[in-house]
């Protein structure tokens, strides 16, 4: 049972390795490859919680805080990597590249530290740091730099809004 629990922790941790490979792809200018690694990391994040509950990792490996591990990996994949993509691929006007990326990182720190981020009925309160999906939409919809900047500002503000958003991505 311990081996299974540790394997689940390893699986969760593989998400940050996938994110790192996405980071390398960004630095190599391979946007599509970065999105592939981002998607693989999203897949890992989508099932690791279920696997953790099935393996009872909290009871079997109590010395490892799986929620903290998941938050570290998520912060990287949902916030750091997308912020870098916005900067590297110049998705906002040049004078706002650093402020936009910095704003994403700053509000994401709050998001991942907010213990009330997930509501009791499985919604997220405010914008839940889905910057990876937002960046994908920017590319797929070929939105303008100004549209992207305005969207980023709105999502940053929505991070602090006391409204429920996006329930279908939350593992129950």
Model-found features: residue ranges?
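C-terminal ends of transmembrane helices
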Residues: 50-59, 109-122, 160-170
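C-terminal membrane-associated helical module and adjoining short loops/tails
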Residues: 121-172
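Topogenic membrane-insertion module of multi-pass membrane proteins
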Residues: 1-49, 161-172
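Alpha-helical transmembrane segments of multi-pass membrane proteins
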Residues: 38-45, 104-114, 152-162
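Juxtamembrane loop-transmembrane helix junctions in multi-pass integral membrane proteins
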Residues: 2-6, 29, 61, 65-68, ...
């Amino acid at each position: 049972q311990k081996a299974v629990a540790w394997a689940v922790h390893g699986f969760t941790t593989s998400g940050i390795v996938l994110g790192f490979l996405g980071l390398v792809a960004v630095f190599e200018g391979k946007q599509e490859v970065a999105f592939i690694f981002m998607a693989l990391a999203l897949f890992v994040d989508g099932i690791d919680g279920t696997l953790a509950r099935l393996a009872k990792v909290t009871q079997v490996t109590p010395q490892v805080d799986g929620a903290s591990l998941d938050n570290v990996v998520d912060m990287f994949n949902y916030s750091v990597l997308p912020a870098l993509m916005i900067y590297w691929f110049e998705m906002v006007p040049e004078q706002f590249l650093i402020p936009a990326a910095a704003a994403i990182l700053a509000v994401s720190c709050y998001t991942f530290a907010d213990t009330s981020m997930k509501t009791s009925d499985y919604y997220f309160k405010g914008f839940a740091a889905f910057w990876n999906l937002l960046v994908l939409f920017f590319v797929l919809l070929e939105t303008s730099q100004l549209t992207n900047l305005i969207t980023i500002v709105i999502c940053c503000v929505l991070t602090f809004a006391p409204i429920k958003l996006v329930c279908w991505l939350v593992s129950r």
